[in-house]
Amino acid sequence: MIFIYAIIALLITFILVPILIPTLKRMKFGQSIREEGPQSHMKKTGTPTMGGLTFLISIIITSIIAIIFVDHSNPIILLLFVTIGFGLIGFIDDYIIVVKKNNQGLTSKQKFLAQIIIAVIFFVLSDVFHLVHFTTDLHIPFVNFDIPLSFAYVIFIVFWQVGFSNAVNLTDGLDGLATGLSIIGFAMYAVMSYMLDSPAIGIFCIIMIFALLGFLPYNLNPAKVFMGDTGSLALGGIFATISIMLNQELSLILIGFVFVVETLSVMLQVASYKLTKKRIFKMSPIHHHFELSGWGEWKVVTVFWTVGLITGLIGLWIGVH
């Protein structure tokens, strides 16, 4: 059945994307590009965005099929809720952006509040309604030590889900970058899930991988479509949720290492400019720094993928030992 889920997820996305692209073009749902960004990006202006809808639809349909046939499918139900919740936030954000024809969508406060609501509902569904059981201890790899957080774990969940949903969003600035890194990350968690005896989560990870593989050919340079916030916010929320449900939260720092570095580069850039009026990087997130330093877009993407693969394998090894 796993093979069937994979094929269904792959085919749905692969078929939907070429249908959605001309529809988005007719509706003029094109991406606006930052004027201060690399000049090579200006030609991307008008490229259809909100393409994340395709793999989210694929994930939803395939997950519902899996829920019907998989024993102990509660983890898939929860992951599906997070997918829809964060995806809806991204969809609303994208819709506002393309209607206004600028790069401003939901305000930071609106987006943050909506993400917090989804994270809290996730905890309530998990803990109060017992859809799944996970410990409220923060597991520290290698030292066989857990930090009991008790109620503070709710705060951690909010921080983790909101943080990583925005981290993937920040990384989605080059053709294929976030998509490829997500495929790598979900592959690591698929293996980890089976090794930690969580097959339902493993099945969901496989659905994620193949849904994204159906999207990747259209998202590679030169991209025919962008996933938009619709896709990136959902992907980040899913990553955080999987790490929480496996009680391997800190593994995400390595499995999602590039996402972490991209986010830190933005935070450091903002802090440095506010404190010293000087910038650390030529532009943030850091992938733009390398572009402005003379790297081609494809080189940046492949190097970042390679880093993501190496750190992902390390994160996987730590997670299962």
Swiss-Prot record:
Subcellular location: Cell membrane
First-listed, main subcellular location of the protein, grouped into a coarse class: membrane
Enzyme Commission number: 2.7.8.13
Record field: catalytic activity: UDP-N-acetyl-alpha-D-muramoyl-L-alanyl-gamma-D-glutamyl-L-lysyl-D-alanyl-D-alanine + di-trans,octa-cis-undecaprenyl phosphate = Mur2Ac(oyl-L-Ala-gamma-D-Glu-L-Lys-D-Ala-D-Ala)-di-trans,octa-cis-undecaprenyl diphosphate + UMP
Assigned GO CC terms: plasma membrane
Endpoints of the signal sequence: none
Record-stated family: Belongs to the glycosyltransferase 4 family. MraY subfamily.
Protein name from the UniProt record: Phospho-N-acetylmuramoyl-pentapeptide-transferase
Organism: Staphylococcus epidermidis (strain ATCC 35984 / DSM 28319 / BCRC 17069 / CCUG 31568 / BM 3577 / RP62A)
